[in-house]
């Protein structure tokens, strides 16, 4: 009874004599919002579970989605970045070339690099989706470890992307980012082949 009275007080339900209660219009809207939140939470948990797995197929699928999003992110960054942002991006990559040694440092640089480009895209939905895909620390360190074991020169790809963005050539920025993510996909595929985890 107390819970029902609280619902009445909050205008979520309304008593109809001795017949019981019905939801108000506000109550129906509120219920729909709760249902939407429940669905989003379920979707988020499923996606987080995928991000924490290390199977070849799941890593490849995550990288395929990243490729689509990050191509657009780089293209928009070439169009929308301020001069100050471009200078900072270039300085950050140039400084990192000589400083990075450990997996953690490389992973931190890689996160920062992709995060800066997403910021410069000026697309909030794109940025938040990429952040969700990129910022799984476990996944990111795994990808860095795989790339290092495959002998990848991670920063070489970054320099190409930066040069295209700083040159303000959207198509070149898109292509450079696509090639970068493709090399990551190839490294992951070759790594799993070597580990005999895929045929």
Predicted regions: what is each one?
Residues 61, 105, 149-153:
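Residue-level "hotspot" positions that anchor or transmit function at local structural transition points
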């Amino acid at each position: 009874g107390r819970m029902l009275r609280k619902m009445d007080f909050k205008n979520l339900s309304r008593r109809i004599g001795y017949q019981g209660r019905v939801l108000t219009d506000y109550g129906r809207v509120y219920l729909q919002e709760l249902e939407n939140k429940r669905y989003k939470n379920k979707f988020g948990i499923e996606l987080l579970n995928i991000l924490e797995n290390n199977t070849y197929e799941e890593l490849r699928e995550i990288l395929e989605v990243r490729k689509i999003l990050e191509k657009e992110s780089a293209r928009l960054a070439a169009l929308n970045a301020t001069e100050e942002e471009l200078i900072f991006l270039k300085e950050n990559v140039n400084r990192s070339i000589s400083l990075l040694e450990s997996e953690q440092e490389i992973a931190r640089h890689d996160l920062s690099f992709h995060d800066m480009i997403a910021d410069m895209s000026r697309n909030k939905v794109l940025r938040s989706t990429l952040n969700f895909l990129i910022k799984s620390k476990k996944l990111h360190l795994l990808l860095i470890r795989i790339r290092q074991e495959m002998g990848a020169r991670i920063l070489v790809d970054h320099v190409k992307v930066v040069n295209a963005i700083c040159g303000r050539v959207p198509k070149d920025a898109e292509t450079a980012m696509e090639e970068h993510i493709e090399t990551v996909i190839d490294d992951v595929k070759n790594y799993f082949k070597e580990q005999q985890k895929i045929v």
